[in-house]
Amino acid sequence: MKKFKKTLMLILAICLIVTSFAGCGGGKDAKSASGENNYGDTYPLNAEGKELSIWSIISVHNKYKSYQDVPFWQEAQKRTGVKLDIEGPTGGQFAESFNLMIASGDLPDIILYDWGYNAHVPGGPDKYIKEKYIIALNDVIDKWAPNLKRELSEDPEMDKAVKTDSGNYYVFPRYEPVTSAWLGPVVRKDWLDDLGLAIPETIEDWHTMLTRFKNEKGSTSPLIYQAGNMKGSGFLSGAFGEMFGFYINDGKIVYGASRPGWKDFLTEMQKWYAEGLIDRDIAAMDSTTMKNKVVSGKNGAFLGSGGMLGTYIPMMKEVDPKAKFAGAPYPVMNKGDRSQFGIHTLSYPGEMSSAISAECDDVELAAKFLDYFYTEEGQLFANFGIEGVTYNMVDGYPKLSDMVINSDDINSTIDEYAISEFSIIDPRYYEQRMVFPEQKEAIKIWGETDAGKHKLPLLLPTEEESDIMAKYTTEVNTFAEEMYIKYLIGAESLESFDSYVDKLYELGLQTVLDTYQTIYERYLNR
């Protein structure tokens, strides 16, 4: 079994910087140990003297010098009975390090990477299987991964999501069967109470609220958001039946920023901006600027995440002890409507999942090691760490221990002992990482949408399709983003909207739409 002892620094010394795989040779044929049950079926495995090498996109926890020092990796070896040799990228240069590793031909047994994310794996996983960098896992799962196989058979959507259009399984996935809406509108609840207003539901409610915040609460920044989050969620624009980018509408892929509803949305937002209801710095809003404005006490509403709330709540208490935040539903046009847009996280976004390389000498051992994390015990370990240390079972619920709860950073402490990317993400994983009840309530409210009906699934374009998308999509999006700001602040009249749409098509929008549709239909036929 290949030990993968060369470090990334050595690879850097022998390889030129690689940005594509042109000219790179494929790996060897996949190999497995003789026999079909060399290590038993229970954990820890009977694997004394055996070792697996892993390249992990997940960096070493910042508290430790090496992977071998991290409690999770130590415990993983103990529980599975498999010794591990673990390496990964340094300095956050994971894509560059991955490309260098692939180009070198010196591959570890297991590669934890963004295998379904086209920007990081151009041409998709089938290309890497064909060129013998990783192996198809169909037979491997049947032979040596009964726990993952059970999960796939019980969840048809998971089964569909984690294989290629040609039917190849390619990873042991990080999968989240129950997803949460991590982003949504937040309002100053104490201001609403002072003014006798309810949590806003409609666009009209929002206009009334923001106007009164400005006029009666002296808000100099009634509404703020980061443009990327607004466009990705359909915040406000969803009330007009649109969101910025590509989405599914009655089985067809459409581009929201080219449609009539987008013009209606821009018309209303231009009015709000002129009335001083949207922050004047909206075009250049970044996370730091947004935080400073929110905690200044002069902001009335923002589009934010549960994590932001966890940061802002204690900071605001120092500015104004009476300040209260509350999550609000995504705005609709008419009271009683259900928002069609919002944040919907894919159960399998294609990120941080484990492939077995074609250089692996012992596929059985690699598969059985990875399959541990789909056992009931393995899932608890991957999500919550070590029972009695980081969590305790209380009436069947894995409750985080006092050691974790009382630490300076709950998330960082858990991450020393648990790496959920190896497994099925337990919804209780996120529940306990939120400190304040406002966070939990907001996420529940934000999830009351039909965003999942419109969200594109994880699509796997071919290499040719990837080239087409790269050629046209950036120009289309860049132009649409520039015009969004111009229309919003009144620098461009909406009388030019038809010409703007024509320009989008000149830049290749129809080609992109046709390509998306082809890929989407392949996905449906998996």
Name every feature range the model reports, one short phrase each.
Residues 1-3:
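N-terminal secretory signal peptides that target proteins for export/translocation
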Residues 6-9, 24-205, 234-235, 244, ...:
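Conserved N-terminal structural module of periplasmic/extracytoplasmic solute-binding proteins
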Residues 19-23:
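C-terminal motif of bacterial Sec signal peptides marking the signal peptidase cleavage site
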Residues 58-71, 179-186, 191-199, 228-278, ...:
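Extracytoplasmic/periplasmic substrate-binding proteins
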Residues 83-89, 280-281, 326-328:
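General small-molecule cofactor/ligand-binding pocket signal
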Residues 118-128, 306-319:
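A ligand-binding cleft/hinge motif common to bilobed small-molecule-binding domains
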Residues 138, 164-231, 247-305, 354-365, ...:
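Helix-loop-helix "hinge/cap" segment bordering the ligand-binding cleft or interdomain interface
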Residues 368-486, 491:
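Conserved small-residue motifs centered on glycine
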